[in-house]
């Protein structure tokens, strides 16, 4: 949606006020639109920066359930040629003999698809721009949130006031909406950081995702599609201790690749970097509740986990699927979308799943 159209829609009271227009927040807006539910989507980031080449080297494993959701909101066809099927997962202890392979039965298809986060953002943003039920407000900072008996509102830094029936916190781990609500949060750090890098390599990966365990943490290689030049590619997620992270990031490209090769052996032959490296701290967090008066949390705003199982985004997308089902039922029954009983249904539906998956991946 263009800035002009979003500006015209600013005065309209919409059904949802989604704060956070990332992968989970924008998917929610698109999924809600399939049920005729309108939304304001507010994000402080610049879409041009988020979709720029080299901005974010991260990639995500998309499960079958998440792929079905993408199909329902109309972006699967655009994404299909950009994804790489995960045919199997190889797990090994420091490349020692005794590798374990997890491979689905022939009738089960693949273990998921790998996508660069940039490609996911581009598909979501393009779809949102074409959806009249979504008023998108990028480059916008929220200065005030209000929840009353009759609705919710958010005031932006430029004085614009957005109104809706239900407030959705989708800003990620540091969600201001969650913090302002006072919901309890269990949180602890792991004392590790994930080093992220894109690799090009001599030999094809054949759809294999590698999980190589070292004392300091897992070293993962996730298969990506070959690039336009035909280079075989993988995404690297290398877990290092917090005390070693700065040193690893400071290594020259040549020294960094030498360390990478030492840990992955010769499985892909010669490797090279395809872009800049990045790193982020690893931690666990989970809210005591995912709902409050006229408010719900989705994605990392409600739960954040170790990336070892690659389930963080998929868990957030399951939040989206459940919330849209609940909201669709509320709309069918003629209820206010902020109805407390309907929100309790979402809380009950998602609470056990998010709690069990989060703790199962707590390392």
Predicted regions and their residues:
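Conserved N-terminal helical subregion
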Residues: 11-12, 71-72, 82-180, 188-193, ...
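N-terminal Rossmann-like FAD-binding beta1-loop-alpha1 element of flavoenzymes
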Residues: 14-41
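Conserved Rossmann-like nucleotide-cofactor binding loop
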Residues: 24, 47, 174
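Glycine-rich FAD pyrophosphate-binding loop
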Residues: 33-56
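N-terminal glycine-rich dinucleotide-binding loop that anchors FAD/FMN and/or NAD(P) in oxidoreductases
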Residues: 56-80
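Conserved FAD-binding catalytic core of PHBH/FMO-like flavoproteins
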Residues: 70, 151-155, 161, 166-277
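FAD/FMN-dependent oxidoreductases across multiple families
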Residues: 246-341
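C-terminal helical "tail/cap" subdomain of flavin- and related membrane-associated enzymes
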Residues: 325-363
